[in-house]
């Protein structure tokens, strides 16, 4: 038996996702964060943006975007960051940190939710449970 595969993305989804990431990047840079990596990929997943805030905290950012009509039908962009997605992001962050040896900085997971024209920045949106 094969593991279930994610549904294919609708046409234009990659361009929409890239535009949302561009918008999120500009939004966060305007608020003092600096980009460390973009679209970090590893065997366990992908992190849209890896940034550092003014206090030196390493920030792993998941960008979620929904057009207004799908947000009404299926919930907002933030609702699409499921516990399974959170686990994949945490695993990818662990991989990122393993590839950057040295003292582990303070880290957090933020979500940028874009619903139509609205941007919501959820700092420390979820954490790693011990």
Curated annotation (Swiss-Prot):
Q: Which InterPro entries match?
A: Restrct_endonuc-II-like, tRNA_endonuc-like_dom_sf, UPF0102_YraN-like
- Recorded GO terms, molecular function? nucleic acid binding
> Could you tell me which Pfam families the record lists for this protein?
UPF0102
Highest rank taxon of the organism = Bacteria
Q: Which HAMAP family match?
A: UPF0102
Q: Which family does the entry's similarity section mention?
A: Belongs to the UPF0102 family.
Q: What is this protein called?
A: UPF0102 protein RSc3265
Q: What is the lineage of its organism?
A: Bacteria, Pseudomonadati, Pseudomonadota, Betaproteobacteria, Burkholderiales
């Amino acid at each position: 038996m094969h593991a279930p595969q994610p549904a294919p993305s609708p046409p234009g989804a990659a361009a929409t996702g890239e535009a949302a990431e561009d918008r999120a990047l500009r939004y966060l840079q305007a608020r003092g964060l600096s980009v460390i990596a973009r679209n970090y990929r590893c065997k366990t997943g992908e992190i849209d943006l890896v940034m550092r805030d003014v206090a030196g905290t390493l920030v792993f950012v998941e960008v979620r975007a929904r057009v207004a009509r799908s947000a009404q039908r299926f919930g907002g962009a933030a609702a699409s960051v499921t516990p399974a997605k959170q686990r994949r992001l945490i695993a990818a962050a662990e991989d990122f940190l393993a590839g950057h040896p040295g003292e582990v900085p303070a880290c957090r997971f933020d979500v940028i939710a874009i619903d139509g024209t609205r941007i919501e920045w959820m700092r420390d949106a979820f954490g790693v449970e011990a």
